């Protein structure tokens, strides 16, 4: 197979739970810990729950990756808050091979997780790559510990919500 459409990629993907199930015991244990650290303000929770459009999230990432463990868990929270949201997970290899050309990202520069936000017709609204912008704007070594402790999960939530709101 030389190409896959965004819809084919979404359909071949797995659930968040299945992707987590592929991890080691310690990798799996980080998910509920990270989930419990997602402290969304009430107004954001209301914004998310009040979105009445279907939103599809295609994630290229894998459970062994700490960035995936943190940022894909934010999507899980979004999906738990709003049943109009769907999530599908594909491997990094599939993302590099098939998703990177769709997003016009060089394969060598493709990072995980890459989270593609789409409408109900699979039109791409935008994407989030690897870490929130606030983390990328800092010297990673200076904030690494806070990042891995989940102190930037709200930044991820804001970026993803901004992509959705820009297109509603």
Residue ranges and their predicted role:
Residues 81-82, 166:
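Secondary-structure boundary elements
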Residues 46-81:
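Local sequence-structure signature of Cys/Sec-based thiol-disulfide redox active-site neighborhoods
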